[in-house]
């Protein structure tokens, strides 16, 4: 509420014009009233309400605030004005002999927090039961100010009905001196703001000067004596304001009190000199030039952006109708100012209020996109009702008032829908039903579909959630401009709906799409805009989505619809042949609806960007569908009506529509897709060829294969073929394959089978002898000694051979080079793939061994654990007789002897082995039968 309190202090003269808080004088930091061209001390309190007066055609002597109210001319022409409504300026003329009153800090009780800080023109608003101070304007004020309107609320009368004209010589009462004591600490600074700041303070009191109608109380003691008592009363009165503010702190109240002091007649005594008037009159020309120059620069920059040709093929446009908007604030018919009053020190992304709905909620607009020209010569109509008229040239009955309690009227002229979209960003004019229950109701930057039927006025839900204004990114602009031709075709088809939608609740709102409104891209729509249960395309979907979806789907108004990711899309209305054809010809873009609460259009654009090189089939990747489903607006609504009534539609070959669709896809820069024509028998079929497109696209999650027979009376659901191009080999299968591969390499490189079966006697003998000698050496010597001897033997052989070859080459004078050069050039590096393959092979055995050990030691099976125990008990006796090396020697002997013996006596060995196996099995069964746990296990 600190911003609100600061924004409403503009009707009174401020004492903090010395630069203490220049940003709060005109409506909070960054508000247009801050008057940056005048410097830190240039913005006084009397111009804090509307700096647009500074930019108007009025002479400097008429630049006054719109907050001075005359006690003799306050009347209410219409007693139906609700409390809290805003008066858009008051034509109040001060009369001679009477002391006009200034309503101090006229605040609106139902004004939401954070809305006043963005206002361009702070309208004079009044709320009941608010204690106010009544400073006056002297009779000798130069050229009585002319204000904007003579309409006030009936609630204003209670503030001024008891005020009597003051005698110029009468001593000021307590109500007149209420707030001057707060400004006593700043009286010296006020004196220095006269036309001659270098002169002494006494010289600044100009009683006869037309530019200095006020007098300065130089004597601080006199100031305290006159205004001390009434300051306390005013402090008590202003203290009651805390009951009307939601979250006003004492610091905020002190800030309000510190900026206000009343004005008195010159004849009645001492008056503080208005530093603002002196500086305002002396710097009016400079301020006008500076503000005009900065605003013109901003307009030029914005117009240059808007004229960028992002898509050369989007030049085919119809005549554009200007979108003119009448804004609240100063009377444009009187001032005829086309320069919007903005704060030039703020960021270009600052939101500027254009008009107010429900008396408090502004429609914000970015100052960087401000290209709107205020309507001249037309007074703002309809102060007592908030309406927004959207009239389309070619769309009858598209002007829809929405009831409300605001005091702003915005008239928008919309173009014919048969024109194509502009080559810049798409504009949007939408209806807003603001109930005032949302503090920061804004409008999301979404596109309204022309197929929406909502002529019936519906109130907004009271539990509307505040939504944040979505900034339009450059990628969104480019994506929007690249789909203009498709939208143009859709709107030509949507014109046919006029003949089939005549009910009051199904009037088309096609006129709400304006190509002349690129500057309204940040204009906001409440997320909970009430709508009827009619089919429409979700506003979050881009134009390409609308042209690609080939299924007539219903749009639930509830925001809690379940997500349909990966499910079949239900064709609730029945798919017409036109819909199926549009679904088949559209390609490479997903019909996506991602209506999440902040991040709506970016997800859709990412999905579309990922699908540039996908299969030439219709992709219905519905990602997190949370509020509505998609509907194809390219289908003809006459056939849609017949489907709804139960009639069986007939398939008619529409070659022209197919060609238009293909041409639109070409203009979008996508791949050309050859659409199949319908057969004479009325059979429309498109088969899914998994080899027809690139197979390396991992973004495709689902493909739709739509096939319809000759009897299209019964709507068929699209068959969704899930893309299973993922490697079908599981991790276990891959590991087994690697194992087989490694074993095959080992068997091929080292023929173990041939080696142990003595296929090559020399090779087998060499290997057998070497290993046996090494094992015998390990039995006789230590491991270190054996390894050292082996290395010495190897080196002795290689060195001897190297020296021998060198001697031979020296004797023969040959250049054969190194004798081991062929072996030195061999690449024996182990690649990461090979290492991983070996590790995978080893890990299989390691994991198997670990699992077996856990099973045995944790007694998963009692018999297996007992077997291990018996084996280990026998090994204790073996270890007492043999050591490890001896066992290895015996194992080698068996390896090189048993296979060849078994090969020779296989039949006899198999017979005796079978007998031994049967005997062992019978013994094990007898043991298991006597154990208690085993019997229960078998019974189970």
Swiss-Prot record:
It is a multi-pass membrane protein. Keywords: Acetylation, Apoptosis, Endoplasmic reticulum, ER-Golgi transport, Golgi apparatus, Membrane, Phosphoprotein, Transmembrane, Transmembrane helix, Transport. InterPro entries: Reticulon, RTN1-4. The modification N-acetylalanine is found at residue 2. It comes from the Eukaryota. GO terms for cellular component: endoplasmic reticulum; endoplasmic reticulum membrane; glutamatergic synapse; Golgi apparatus; Golgi membrane; neuron projection; postsynaptic density; presynapse. Residues 472-490 have a biased composition (Basic and acidic residues). The modification Phosphothreonine is found at residue 572. Residues 908-910 are annotated as: Interaction with BACE1. Residues 491-512, 689-699 have a biased composition (Polar residues). Residues 1-32, 71-91, 129-182, 314-335, 381-405, 428-512, 623-655, 672-701 are annotated as: Disordered. Residues 1-24 have a biased composition (Low complexity). Residues 2-771, 796-852, 876-879, 903-940 are cytoplasmic. It is found in: Endoplasmic reticulum membrane; Golgi apparatus membrane. Present in olfactory bulb, olfactory epithelium and retina (at protein level). The modification Phosphoserine is found at residues 31, 196, 204, 209, 212, 249, 282, 508, 575-576, 652. GO terms for biological process: apoptotic process; brain development; endoplasmic reticulum tubular network formation; endoplasmic reticulum tubular network organization; negative regulation of amyloid-beta formation; neuron differentiation; vesicle-mediated transport. Residues 752-940 form the Reticulon domain. Residues 772-795, 853-875, 880-902 dip into the membrane without crossing it. May be involved in membrane trafficking in the early secretory pathway. Inhibits BACE1 activity and amyloid precursor protein processing. May induce caspase-8 cascade and apoptosis. May favor BCL2 translocation to the mitochondria upon endoplasmic reticulum stress. Induces the formation of endoplasmic reticulum tubules. Acts also as an inflammation-resolving regulator by interacting with both TRIM25 and RIGI, subsequently impairing RIGI 'Lys-63'-linked polyubiquitination leading to IRF3 and NF-kappa-B inhibition. Homodimer. Interacts with RTN4. Isoform 2 interacts with BACE1, BACE2, BCL2 and FADD. Interacts with ATL2. Interacts with TMEM33. Interacts with ATL1. Interacts with ZFYVE27 and with KIF5A in a ZFYVE27-dependent manner. Interacts with RIGI. Interacts with TRIM25. This is Reticulon-3. It comes from Rattus norvegicus. The lineage of its organism: Eukaryota, Metazoa, Chordata, Craniata, Vertebrata. The gene is Rtn3.
